[in-house]
């Protein structure tokens, strides 16, 4: 299990329906550069700009889309892409520490749950919407060595979405995935817009 916690200790990812991926890919101008690799080895593949790195895992009717740049995809874009569809967004960063879970559906943000620590000791919560069924998971399975169990909340949500136990999530580290590159210009555009929105 610790391999799973270690991998997701600093990750951002989406879960989107398969039929939405073409629109998502076109919007980001994704360029496929490798196939049939795994998340176990993906960090060993160097790309000049880590923000340009995006990977996908095919899970029958949905994709897990992982990449640091997902942090910079603004809310408006996700709302637009969720038209007649859904998008789940997740972020875990133990180094801050912080975590985020968002659920978009039919151009609406239905649920947002974010935790971070302020003043070193106080856990701050930002919450929109009511807790959903997919957020009810067996918390006893999340026991990370670093002691930040509550910040792995997104893994509990993902286990319910994939209808598996949290302990079984480690299998996805060995699933075949595809590696894409986002053009540097597109990454800069996403980042600039993200920083601009922070100033508002």
What are these language model-derived features?
Residues 4-10, 41-42, 105, 109, ...:
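Residue-level signal for functionally critical sites in structured catalytic/ligand-binding pockets
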Residues 24, 77-81, 158:
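Broad structural signal for hydrophobic residues in well-ordered alpha-helices, predominantly aliphatic
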Residues 33-115:
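Short, intrinsically disordered low-complexity segments
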Residues 2-4, 78, 89-92, 98, ...:
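Short, flexible coil/linker segments at or flanking structured domains
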Residues 1-34, 196-200:
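Short, extreme N-terminal segment that most often corresponds to the first beta-strand
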Residues 117-200:
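Long, compositionally biased intrinsically disordered terminal regions
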Residues 5-6, 31, 87, 172, ...:
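Alpha-helical protein-protein interaction elements
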Residues 1, 26, 57-60, 65, ...:
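Intrinsic disorder/low-complexity signal
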């Amino acid at each position: 299990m610790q391999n799973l916690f270690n991998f997701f200790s600093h990750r951002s990812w989406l879960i989107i329906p398969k039929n939405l991926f073409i629109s998502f890919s076109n919007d980001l101008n994704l360029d496929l550069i490798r196939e049939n690799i795994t998340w176990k080895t993906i960090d060993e593949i160097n790309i000049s700009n880590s923000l340009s790195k995006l990977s996908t895992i095919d899970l029958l009717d949905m994709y897990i889309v992982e990449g640091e740049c997902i942090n910079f995809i603004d809310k408006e874009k996700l709302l637009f892409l969720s038209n007649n569809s859904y998008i789940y967004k997740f972020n875990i960063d133990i180094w801050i520490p912080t975590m985020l879970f968002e659920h978009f559906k039919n151009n609406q943000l239905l649920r947002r749950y974010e935790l971070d620590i302020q003043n070193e000791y106080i856990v701050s919560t930002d919450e929109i919407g009511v807790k959903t069924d997919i957020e009810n998971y067996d918390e006893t399975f999340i026991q990370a060595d670093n002691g930040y169990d509550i910040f792995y909340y997104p893994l509990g949500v993902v286990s319910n979405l994939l209808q598996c136990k949290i302990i079984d999530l480690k299998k996805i580290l060995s699933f075949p995935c595809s590696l894409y590159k986002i053009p540097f210009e597109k990454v800069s555009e996403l980042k600039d817009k993200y920083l601009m929105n922070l100033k508002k």
